Each structure stands twice: as structure tokens, then as C-alpha cells.
Amino acid sequence: MRQPVFWSLALAEITDPDYTHIAVDVLPAHATADPSAWARSLFSLKSLPRSLAWAMRARLLLNARLGPPGWCEAFQVGQVAGDEALVAMNGRLLDLRVGIGVDEDAALVRVVTAVRFKGAHVQRWSWPVRAALPFVMRGMIGRSRRTLSGVTRA
């Protein structure tokens, strides 16, 4: 029997996070086991909740006037090690690391989020985000599962 082991690039980058969230789901039968493909799918506009996707699309329309938004480059795969890809973002108010891992043997996909807040005031206003993140992440993983497995909705 295998011994349980937990490791993530997200927790290796931020060793003392102020907030963490872990989501695990089943790897669909015909889906890719490439963690970078999962990371790209997870942070694509198709996987985001509709309200966030519309806000980002509206911001993209303003590019000509305001210049490209920083998040266009922020949510790109920065590193791949073994069965996990890392998406990193360093912001003015927080540092974010998201490790997207695919365990092909166990047929699992895991998403580990680690956040370091910069300043006490940021921790206070982050409570709504903390409360919503599990639900948002479940939806993002579900949409990515459907996209990467080739399942279409009727």
C-alpha cells in the first residue's frame, strides 16, 4: 500500500501562507494528464465564472485605451516539475501561487492555492474572497474537466 504524501510547488514557493485552499477532483477517462494543459484550461476565460469572464472581456476591450492588463501575463504557467504546473502572481496586495497537479495513477487532479497577504488591511477585506474561492474553484475545475475530456453539453 502506498503511503500518503503531500507536496506542492505552491507551498514550496510560499512556505508560510496566510491562506490556503486545496481542491481534488477525478481525472476524466479521456482527459490529458499534462499539468500545464490543465493549468491553461483552468485559467482560461471559458473556465472562469461568467461574471469574472465578462469583467475580463470588458477589460480586454479597453486595451487600446488603457494598455494590456497585467493579469494577461500573470496567469501563465511559470514552471512544471513532475506532475505539477505552477502559476504564480506577485501583486501589490498579495502573492498568489496555484499548483495544478495531475496524478495519472490515482486518476486525480489537484489544485493547491497558497496566498500571502501584504498588510493587515488586506486580510480584513479578503474574507469574501476566502468564502467564495472553494465554490469558484469547483466550478473552474468542473468546466476544465468537461473541456479536457471532450464531453459536450446538450
Predicted region positions:
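Beta-strand/loop substructures that line and gate deep hydrophobic ligand-binding cavities in soluble
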Residues: R92-A131
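A conserved amphipathic terminal alpha-helix motif
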Residues: R124-A154
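Hydrophobic ligand-binding cavity/cleft-lining segments
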Residues: M1-L61
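Short C-terminal domain-edge/linker segments immediately following a structured domain
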Residues: W54-A58, F117-K118, M140-T147
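Hydrophobic-ligand binding "helix-grip"
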Residues: G67-D105
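Intrinsic-disorder/low-complexity, polar/charged segments enriched in Ser/Thr/Lys/Arg/Asp/Glu/Gln
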Residues: D18-V24, E84, L108-R110
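Residue-level marker of positions within ordered structural domains that often coincide
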Residues: H30, F43, G82, R116, ...
